[in-house]
Regions:
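Loop-to-transmembrane alpha-helix initiation sites
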Residues: 129, 145-153, 166-178
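Cytosolic, membrane-interface loops and tails of multi-pass inner-membrane proteins
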Residues: 22-57, 191-202
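Interfacial segments of multi-pass membrane proteins
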Residues: 45-52, 78-81, 98, 112-142, ...
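Short, non-helical or kinked segments that cap or interrupt transmembrane helices
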Residues: 29-40, 104-117, 144-152
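Core segments of transmembrane alpha-helices
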Residues: 63-76, 113, 129-132, 151-156, ...
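Nucleotide and nucleotide-moiety/phosphate-recognizing core
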Residues: 51, 59-65, 70-103, 134-136, ...
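Helix-coil boundary and interhelical linker segments in multi-pass alpha-helical membrane proteins
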Residues: 1-9, 73-90, 121-128, 161-174
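N-terminal signal-anchor transmembrane alpha helix
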Residues: 1-27
């Protein structure tokens, strides 16, 4: 299988908008028209708690799992067929781009945190676990999803420099490309954080 075909498949798989589909199918809601308009688990939880509070956490959890799973799935399949490390990292970047700029939603999409965690869990698991611990602590204490996610991502990247001194592709550049995408997708959240307007998840 050529790399170009792999890249296309990674982009299409990454673009599957699970949050949008789940909210539409199970609650009859266009998630893009409610709350923050984001298709991620946080907005699914926030919006569905008002409509179907009994199932909101389950559906948000399912969204989180599937968004992470598609990132891991792409990398696991690529490893199984034996592609090189450089291609694996390229696929990781592309599956995240697919999620953030979905071809199925007119190139709009989520913010990439769960898909990043899934893809990188296969490539640099220890760094991801460090980031997840930080994210979890922040989420439980500060209860601001965007701040928790951004902090977890940055801590995970910096920990990769310690835990993976000799990265398989001789560079940590893909991590910073991914970080840039996620920060870009959170630009409105960052503005609200700076101005004290960002909402908590309760």
């Amino acid at each position: 299988m050529s790399n170009l075909l792999l890249y296309l498949l990674a982009y299409l798989i990454g673009g599957i908008p699970f949050g949008y589909v789940i909210a539409k199918y199970f609650a009859g809601v266009n998630i893009k028209e409610h709350g923050s308009g984001n298709i991620g688990a946080t907005n699914v939880l926030r919006v569905l708690k008002k409509i179907d509070p009994k199932r909101a956490k389950v559906l948000a959890g399912l969204t989180l799992f599937l968004d992470a799973f598609k990132g891991a799935f792409v990398i696991l399949v690529a490893k199984f067929i034996g592609v090189c490390d450089a291609t694996l990292w390229t696929l990781a970047v592309i599956v995240i781009i697919g999620h953030c700029f979905s071809p199925f939603l007119k190139f709009e999409g989520g913010k990439g945190v769960a898909t990043t965690a899934g893809a990188l869990l296969v490539l640099i698991p220890y760094a991801v676990l460090v980031g997840l611990v930080v994210w979890f602590i922040m989420a439980k204490t500060v209860k601001i999803s965007s701040l928790s996610s951004l902090t977890g991502i940055l801590v995970g990247i910096f920990s990769a420099y310690i835990l993976y001194l000799h990265p398989s592709i001789e560079s940590h550049a893909p991590l910073w490309i991914i970080a840039f995408i996620i920060v870009y997708k959170h630009r409105e959240n960052i503005y609200r954080l700076v101005t004290g307007q960002e909402k908590r998840v309760v």
